[in-house]
Amino acid sequence: MFTDNIKTMGTNEDNYNVTILIAEDEESNFLLLKTILKRHCNVLQARTGLELLKVFEEKGADLILLDIKMPEMNGIDALKEIRKKDTQIPVIMQSAYAFENDMEAARAAGSNGFITKLINIVELKNTISKFLPQITW
């Protein structure tokens, strides 16, 4: 696992064929995800639910990692808005708390998956690979 962390260090040159939009209001959580992903795909950030909708509309993405607890608009409501415009994009919900009611609300809103924080790198990569098999880890 330590080598996984080292392997993901580097810069994002915006030349990958895949873009992942990370909707995360906690900067440390975003930086962790970005560090893991940036050598494999383009990474976009949204810090609020409303910013997520704007970034997605303006730039698009191939997959969204979406925190359930977001300011201005929570992740479930943001997902419902995304599903009104795009029913196909994979959306993986994240939460620090794996409450069954959160997972059920995420599924009902159209989530494609659910991961918990603290991030398990293997679980994250496996979940993303289900929807974006072209990413090479």
Set out the residue ranges of the language-model regions:
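Acidic, metal-coordinating helix/loop segments flanking the phosphotransfer/catalytic sites
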Residues: Q45-L63
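Two-component/phosphorelay signaling modules centered on CheY-like receiver
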Residues: E26-L44
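Receiver (REC) domain active-site loop signature in two-component systems and cognate sites
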Residues: M70
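Non-catalytic signal-transmission and effector/linker regions of two-component phosphorelay proteins
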Residues: M1-L21, N42, V122-W137
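Acidic catalytic/metal-coordinating carboxylates
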Residues: T48-E51, N74-D77, G110
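Short amphipathic alpha-helix used as the core "switch/output" element in two-component signaling
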Residues: K54, I76-T87
